[in-house]
């Protein structure tokens, strides 16, 4: 069993790279089966705004990297400088740290655990999880729970949603005179909507592809909803735009923003693009009256209050180190399984051979007591031939070591 994690995250790659290797959840099952067919025995894919990671059971992690590049129609060398490949123990520790929020842009954030569980459910339904990854993720979720229960890692955590609100306050001051637009209606937008709603802006509007889901979210925050198709005509109405959809292509183009700014008579517009791939064309941020921030730009704000959680992080790391050691012990026992199986199969062949001989002798009328005696002697000789021959053939230190091992194996204490 060879465990590897291959991936990119917010510390190794900018959003312009991460968006090129991101996966939408609805495409993950097909992607996993495709990865499986390229020599990867087991696989799960975790894809969020901050990371894309492949958890694999494979002899050759290079295959996973090449598959990732080919799947997204990229050259492997284009993403290789941003990728990390973590083998065995490092992969286990990484999974535990990710689920516990220690590897997040927002230290201690809880959202990643739900995202990881969803990734595992998708892999399970796709049939790409085996013994190794099942056990890894079972332990991962257990460790994450232990970390959150026994440390204050999640205390005073500044989420991306909260960071967006703080940044808007830095631009506008109080938010009670602003019109706010949310594009999308997923979990991230829901969190942002709750934070902005608490500041009682002039209006809250949710734009979504399907009106029903948009209306549902809008109702929960005392806002209104609109269709995404109406965005080009209505963008100018809003001072603050927060977007996070699963679109593979930008929803808000440079031209749309230029028209909105002209219609607003160059009144500033604050925009936060939390999507990966990005929802807003980055060129829009170059306009004089547009303050455009991506998920990477929020990093500085979410670092605030980090010092308060460093002690909790150290406690969490200690728990994780201990649990990694436990998992590696399990993994070592699993590596002996093929040998144990082969040993049992060999013993079973000897048993069946001698049993067949005994049955033939009994059928010919031989004395049952003598047949049983011959059977037991033959089995003893067959089963001990290998160890005896190895011990007789060994010399020097090898012989001493082998003798000690055999005494331990057969529990010979005299």
From Swiss-Prot:
Disulfide bonds: none annotated. InterPro entries: 4pyrrol_synth_GluRdtase, 4pyrrol_synth_GluRdtase_dimer, 4pyrrol_synth_GluRdtase_N, GluRdtase_CS, GluRdtase_dimer_dom_sf, GluRdtase_N_sf, NAD(P)-bd_dom_sf, Shikm_DH/Glu-tRNA_Rdtase. Its EC number is 1.2.1.70. The active site is at residue 49. It comes from the Bacteria. Keywords: NADP, Oxidoreductase, Porphyrin biosynthesis. The record marks 94 as: Important for activity. NADP(+) binds at residues 184-189. Gene3D superfamilies: Glutamyl-tRNA reductase, N-terminal domain, NAD(P)-binding Rossmann-like Domain. GO terms for biological process: protoporphyrinogen IX biosynthetic process from glutamate. GO terms for molecular function: glutamyl-tRNA reductase activity; NADP binding. Substrate binds at residues 48-51, 104, 109-111, 115. Pathway: Porphyrin-containing compound metabolism; protoporphyrin-IX biosynthesis; 5-aminolevulinate from L-glutamyl-tRNA(Glu): step 1/2. Catalyzes the NADPH-dependent reduction of glutamyl-tRNA(Glu) to glutamate 1-semialdehyde (GSA). Possesses an unusual extended V-shaped dimeric structure with each monomer consisting of three distinct domains arranged along a curved 'spinal' alpha-helix. The N-terminal catalytic domain specifically recognizes the glutamate moiety of the substrate. The second domain is the NADPH-binding domain, and the third C-terminal domain is responsible for dimerization. Belongs to the glutamyl-tRNA reductase family. PANTHER family: GLUTAMYL-TRNA REDUCTASE. Homodimer. This is Glutamyl-tRNA reductase. The lineage of its organism: Bacteria, Pseudomonadati, Pseudomonadota, Betaproteobacteria, Nitrosomonadales.
